Regions:
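Alpha-helical recognition segments enriched in aromatics with Gly/Pro capping
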Residues: 2-78, 85, 92, 175
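Small-residue-rich helix-loop
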Residues: 83-175
């Protein structure tokens, strides 16, 4: 945790927005620096903040800027965002990474719950443009009894199931 300081890196609102944070998340997060709402709710709209804010709940200790918590909060805002709005805002970021003709809506639905800031999109989808080199030992798993010899057969067996899959969310994949 660091005190908010321009000397310790990006500190302005504009810097945070440029890094891929949502305005709503930044405002919500900053409002909670040094203030605790009565009901311990962490998520507020701007109107709710105006209504709920009470200076009697200000902390006497200095506020600590926790970038990890801001990233988490921003990710929660992205998860709750209406899909059409998410898609519209994510599309330029996806197109920066993927130049091929792909179903960007489906791609957006797959990454919506997996990113915390817009800049995370690149690491989630860059494999579409170029498959990275993988260590072949990732196919070895003693508990699942897979090794370099039988892994190809297992992958061939799973491929038809994955091709039929329409929902690639974590919950759907692990059903």
């Amino acid at each position: 945790h660091k005190k908010l300081s321009k000397r310790s890196g990006h500190a302005s609102y504009e810097d945070l927005i440029d890094q891929g944070f949502l305005t709503e998340a930044v405002i919500n997060f900053v409002a909670l620096l040094g203030w605790s709402p009565e009901d311990n709710n962490e998520f507020f709209t701007l109107d709710e903040l105006v209504k709920e804010f009470d200076y009697h709940h200000m902390s006497k200790t200095p506020a600590v800027f926790d970038m990890t918590k801001l990233r988490w909060m921003n990710g929660e805002y992205l998860k709750k965002m209406d899909f059409d709005k998410f898609y519209e805002m994510a599309l330029p970021h996806m197109k920066e990474v993927v130049s091929r003709d792909v179903n960007f809506e489906k791609l957006a639905s797959m990454i919506k719950t997996r990113i915390e800031i817009w800049a995370d999109i690149k690491d989630q989808i860059d494999f579409i443009e170029q498959v990275p080199d993988y260590d072949i030992n990732m196919y070895v798993h003693k508990k699942n009894k897979t090794n370099l010899e039988n892994s190809l057969e297992v992958l061939k067996e799973v491929q038809p199931l994955l091709e039929k899959q329409e929902d690639y969310s974590n919950d759907a994949l692990f059903e």
